[in-house]
Amino acid sequence: PFGSGCTYIAKTFLESAGYRYLSLSDILKSEFHDTDPPSRTAMQDLGNQLREQDGADILAKKACEIIDHAENDKWVIDSIRNTHEIELFKKRFGTFYVIAAWADQETRWKRVESKYERNRVSFDADDSRDSRENAETGQQVSLCYQMADIIIINNKNIISPGTDEYTKLETVVRRYINIIEGIESFSPTEQETLMSMAYANSMRSSCSQRKVGALIIDDYGNVFSSGYNEVPSSERPCKNTYGKCYRKYLRDKFSDELTSIIHDDEAR
């Protein structure tokens, strides 16, 4: 989500490693014709509108056009907010990796409060919408997180290069760059190993919309128990009955009925 430091990491560490920066938000901003910078709400509205009109992966397609006409062979793409954008990039590029940056809400608020003129209510509204819209063409940051190959914790405020926090973040990012480019290989850390175990547990869930795995460990990393979310024992999984999540089934059914009503009214 915004304020987590994705842009900072991309421009500070990946650009210096030879990656060319490309932002889907910048592509979206080019669709605005007003001279004043658009608000985040306006950006969200236009992004949803474009995805509804031209497909949920329209911004990713525009990014691919830019990449196809450039000579660079290494790119870092910022501001991905819809799962269809990730799916297109993975189909289009054989070595495409999703790197997510995470910071807690309070840290992110402190980073962006001046842009919001210290209006916390507006920040909370934008933050909620940015992460949890249900529409296929909406803001799906939370779902994009679930598709991440790498998650970088960026919960510290970095004042300037050379500080301990800057060096720690740089070391983490460089490590993943070297792994991606095949320069070095590393054994996974204890935390990475445990998270992989939790993820493997999540795959046991028959819920078609959200899969969550968890581990209970002690201070030394010993696993005491593991688990995952599951459909209630008395219920059948939605995908067995409806072929998809029941909520999505209802949304699609409502959308089809509404479209039919509109077309009938236009035909009269």
What is the meaning of each model-derived region?
Residues 58, 86, 113-173:
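Small-molecule kinase domains that catalyze NTP-dependent phosphoryl transfer to phosphate-bearing small molecules
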Residues 2:
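The conserved Walker
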Residues 9, 13:
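Hydrophobic positions on the alpha1 helix immediately C-terminal to the Walker A/P-loop
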Residues 20-75, 80-87:
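ATP-dependent small-molecule kinase phosphotransfer cores
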Residues 186-212:
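Short, basic/aromatic recognition patches
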Residues 78-80, 90-116:
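Conserved phosphate-donor/acceptor-positioning beta-strand/loop module used by diverse small-molecule
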Residues 228-268:
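A short, polar/charged loop-to-alpha-helix boundary motif
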Residues 6:
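Conserved lysine of the Walker
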